[in-house]
Regions:
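The DNA-recognition helices of helix-turn-helix-type DNA-binding domains
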Residues: 54, 232, 318
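Proteins enriched for Cys/Gly/acidic motifs involved in redox and nucleic-acid/cofactor modification
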Residues: 1-159, 198, 209, 213, ...
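A short, hydrophobic C-terminal helix/tail in secreted or cell-surface proteins
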Residues: 313-319
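Conserved SAM/AdoMet-binding glycine-rich loop
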Residues: 14, 23, 143-266
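Short acidic, glycine/proline-enriched helix-loop-strand junctions
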Residues: 301-306
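Anionic-ligand binding region
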Residues: 298
Length: 319
């Protein structure tokens, strides 16, 4: 649709960014000639100069077209190595989440390599942003009126392991709490097996840290968790939830689940439903499994067809 708009002159520039741009950069250039630039997962800090370059070229081409044959349009491919760490955004951030809330990305990439996930292959290994850069970015956001910081990464709880040799999220949180103007700090994407007593203690101590955790567990049954390449089991998940609610009684827990993973049986699905009922999560996101090209799970036996993914819902409607 955007390519059609470009053909009709409704767009001055068409730029494709993100994970799919990183993965299919060559195909995009070949199959969608209207695209002016492809910017990968580590090239986003260059989007403004690239846009300036493209618009300047477009303006020059329009002038040339009036007097001579226009030159062939250039194509910008900005997909640096996925193992590079993008430059600090402290002085370049544009907040698009409203005036009082902003995301603070504390790391790039992931080392977990769950069998269903393509992220490590298009975002690279786990790289923590330097703590001082994050604190500077947070200060700039606070100066701009931001009151709530939402910490994100593919996995927030191992922040610092790659560059400091330790889980430094508790330390980062403590320092963020010292920034004047920041009133709330929310933590997303905490892997269950990486949540430490130190992190729980900091959450209890610091009043600015919301009693809220997003903990993606993906499934409850040990056989499926193992096939997924997850590093925890049902008993450990139950123990963690009980511990969090004991230590922080008013904590709000959110999680995500995948249904229809290759090899999942009806019994395992029902066991997961029972698990969710017993755990009483406050927020829940449920997604049907989707085979991702290039992942181990996509090659597994027992792929479940779309018509079967919703069998239980259909049965409920008939009842």
């Amino acid at each position: 649709e955007m390519a059609e708009w470009k053909k009709k002159g409704r767009l001055k520039a068409l730029i494709v960014t993100g994970c799919m741009a990183q993965r299919y950069q060559d195909e995009i250039q070949q199959e969608i000639p209207e695209v002016d630039a492809v910017i990968g997962t580590t090239g986003y800090t260059e989007i403004v100069p690239i846009l300036d370059e493209i618009l300047a070229e477009a303006e020059a081409s329009q002038k040339e077209a009036a007097v001579e044959e226009p030159k062939e349009k250039s194509f910008v491919n900005c997909c640096p190595s996925i193992d590079l760490l993008p430059a600090s955004l402290a002085d370049k951030r544009v907040v698009t989440t409203g005036g009082y809330t902003a995301y603070l990305k504390i790391a790039e990439g992931c080392n977990k390599r769950c069998t269903y996930c393509i992220i490590p292959y298009i975002r690279g290994h786990y790289r923590s942003f330097p703590m001082e850069d994050l604190l500077e970015e947070a200060r700039k956001l606070a100066e701009g009126g931001v009151k709530e910081l939402i910490l994100i990464a593919q996995e927030t709880t191992v922040y610092g392991m790659d560059c400091y040799g330790r889980k430094a999220l508790p330390e980062l949180l403590t320092k963020l709490c010292e920034i004047e103007g920041i009133e709330w700090i929310r933590i997303l994407y905490c892997y269950p097996e990486e949540i430490t007593d130190e992190l729980i203690a900091v959450m209890k101590k610091e009043k600015k840290i919301c009693h809220y955790l997003d903990i993606p567990i993906q499934h409850s049954e040990d056989t499926i968790l193992k096939r997924m390449g997850r590093r925890t089991n049902r008993a450990e998940l139950v123990s963690l939830v009980e511990k969090l609610r004991k230590e922080i009684p008013d904590i709000v827990l959110r999680t995500t689940l995948i249904t229809g993973f290759p090899g999942e049986t009806e019994e395992e699905f029902k066991n997961m439903v029972d698990f969710v009922d017993s755990m009483e999560f406050d927020r829940l996101g449920v997604f049907p499994y989707s085979a991702e090209e290039g992942t181990k799970a996509a090659e597994m036996d027992g792929q479940i067809t779309d018509c079967l993914l919703y069998t239980s819902d259909a049965a409920d409607e008939e009842d």
